[in-house]
């Protein structure tokens, strides 16, 4: 679900544990056409609160990855995976025939890599996945904060 939060675009994913994509920013705002985008991903529920800063090159194609999953609504064999530039956010997708299961991984940055957190969200193939891809695309294309 796409919304506004503190004057910035927010994408919320999930049910029991909510994933929030927010606070999009350019890593080097003084560089013209800087491709490095940073944003926060927060996983939150009554029992957990985890936040990671994600570094990408113009989103690393996360929206394209999700759009391809939506286009393959009839299903695929095995696991499809995506990772951000520095591996702080990972995503794996499995199609069960009735649902697409997305496992979102939030990771501590190297070299420490002391922790990692994963949560799986279920989505209907096709339109539900297309909406998620569109929301992530709008988020990544929104005006980064200074």
Label each residue range with its predicted role.
Residues 109-146:
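Mixed-charge, glycine-accented linear interaction segment located at domain edges/termini
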Residues 74-89, 142-146:
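Short glycine-rich, low-complexity/disordered patches
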């Amino acid at each position: 679900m796409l919304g506004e939060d503190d004057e910035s675009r927010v994408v919320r994913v999930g049910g029991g544990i909510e994933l929030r994509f927010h606070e999009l920013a350019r890593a080097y705002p003084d560089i013209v056409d800087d491709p490095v985008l940073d944003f926060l991903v927060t996983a939150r529920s009554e029992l957990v609160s985890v936040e990671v800063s994600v570094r990408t090159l113009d989103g690393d194609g996360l929206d394209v990855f999700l759009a391809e999953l939506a286009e393959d609504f009839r299903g695929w064999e095995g696991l499809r995976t995506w990772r951000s530039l520095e591996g702080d956010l990972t995503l794996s997708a499995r199609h069960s025939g009735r649902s697409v299961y997305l496992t979102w991984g939030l990771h501590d940055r190297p070299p420490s890599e002391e922790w990692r957190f994963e949560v799986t969200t279920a989505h209907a193939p096709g339109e539900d996945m297309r909406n998620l891809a569109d929301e992530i695309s709008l988020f990544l294309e929104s005006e980064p904060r200074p």
